[in-house]
């Protein structure tokens, strides 16, 4: 229910403001608006105010603004001056562009509001490399500072991860790093076409790198877990399992995952004294029906390293909204690059998410707090704005192309050309929606 409410609220905000952008500019341009609807289908709420019918409909996958238009039915003589299709192309361009531009402006405001509460930045340093992962096979080492991905400079951990994941299935990914010793080198990830890369793309997942260094000290023990039953407490240092030394937390985590229901004899230190305990990991079924072990221990991060890579501060309100602008421009450019890679075949369609995934992320971000949810809304608003500006007929961007061509030529494009374009655009969007739903379902099924 929490996830559903977070998703519905997000759709109401983002779609309402997108359509309100169209509505406001249409009214400013003297166009009569007949209906403003959030959602598709038969409205369950209708309120008439002035010339406009305001509606809420049950399918929360979009909305629309219906204007007087001679192409969509008979228009009275009195309403002809207020018909959308009778306006100068410049006015129609302004009306159509207003929706996606409102989404981009909203993203700036949402990011700015979030940043005004405080900002935490993670520098692009590798803290931990998990064994037997894409990153480990590429030769990444703890202490590497990621400087660029395929020649694109990266300034923080999030940007570095996004660039790597988006390029993963396009071919070799050249990651420029500065090693812990200060040497400049390139780590090459060659995972295109592998099942592992496909899984990472579909789940926007984990390539085996973490910014944090994790010690072999227990940072937390879950109540009722096998670890608590065995007597473990926060601060215990794990030293050996079944007589073999534990070199890293990843080693211990891999052992427990591979040992569901099997007894493990753990050696640990507490207050300078050595203790042993028998732990039998709980058996947990994953979405793909594989069974893993879980003991309920969380690691303690290396606090000195954490202080080195993490920077927390509270910018001024002016600076916060300036950062919101920068973040919106950056994410818009990343989204455009992704669509370009998608068209050229250099990005996987597995990255496309539908409403189920968006709803899941909405719920997760809302649980993390207001800032996380605001930034989720901003990111989806950017995606909505950029997507609608693409020059695809049926989208706002496609209509912008038609009206710009009309302005240049002095007359509209032929009806046949427009119809072919609209059919092509509709087919493309139906295909994209089908892929998005397919990806959603396969993600849910693991």
From Swiss-Prot:
Source taxon at top rank: Bacteria
Membrane-traversing stretches: 93-115, 376-398, 419-438
Uppermost EC category: hydrolase
Domain PDZ residue range list: 100-181
Localization terms from the record: Cell inner membrane
Chain sites annotated for binding Zn(2+): 18, 22
Listed InterPro entries: PDZ, PDZ_6, PDZ_sf, Pept_M50_Zn, Peptidase_M50
GO cellular component, one term: plasma membrane
EC number assigned by the record: 3.4.24.-
Swiss-Prot/TrEMBL cofactor(s): Zn(2+)
Any one Pfam family match given in the protein's UniProt record, by short name: Peptidase_M50
Entry annotation: catalytic residues: 19
GO terms under biological process: proteolysis
Keywords per UniProt: Cell inner membrane, Cell membrane, Hydrolase, Membrane, Metal-binding, Metalloprotease, Protease, Transmembrane, Transmembrane helix, Zinc
Membrane topology, as annotated: Multi-pass membrane protein
GO molecular function, one term: metalloendopeptidase activity
PANTHER family: MEMBRANE METALLOPROTEASE ARASP2, CHLOROPLASTIC-RELATED (PTHR42837:SF2), REGULATOR OF SIGMA-E PROTEASE RSEP (PTHR42837)
Family: Belongs to the peptidase M50B family.
Name this polypeptide is given: Putative zinc metalloprotease NMA0084
Species of the source: Neisseria meningitidis serogroup A / serotype 4A (strain DSM 15465 / Z2491)
